[in-house]
Amino acid sequence: YILNMVYTETLREEEGGTYGASANTQCIFEPISMKTMEIAFQTNVEQADKLRELAKSGFENIAKNGPDAEKFDKAVNNLKKEIPESRHNLSYWSNALSTSDKLGIDFNAEYENAVNSLTLSDVQEAAKSLISSGNFIEIVMRPE
């Protein structure tokens, strides 16, 4: 959520370069533990390189300085709001049962606890961890 807000502000509103950008993270535990983040947006050829650099610098800024407190609060409040809503979805319970079985934890309770205890520092450390991994793939598709 935080990066989505950053990118709406910079890539869309300030630069007028895209209708929207999305940042999605995923944690995988098997067969190996892995964290991934995908940042995606569409733009015109003329602005592609500039927006790509702005997207990277927005993420790097969070790793270096931590997230903006207002954006952090909005993101956490949104996550808290989604918890009871998610519990009405089969996919939530499928994931909760699978995670509980594989990791031996009560996903339903632990997820809510994790959201409630999330700090600005946690977000900054997660960003640092992703950047310091050194695994970075950049894909730019341009028309011929």
For the regions a protein language model found, what residue spans apply to each?
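M16 family metallopeptidases and their MPP-like homologs
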Residues: T8, R12-S117, G134-P143
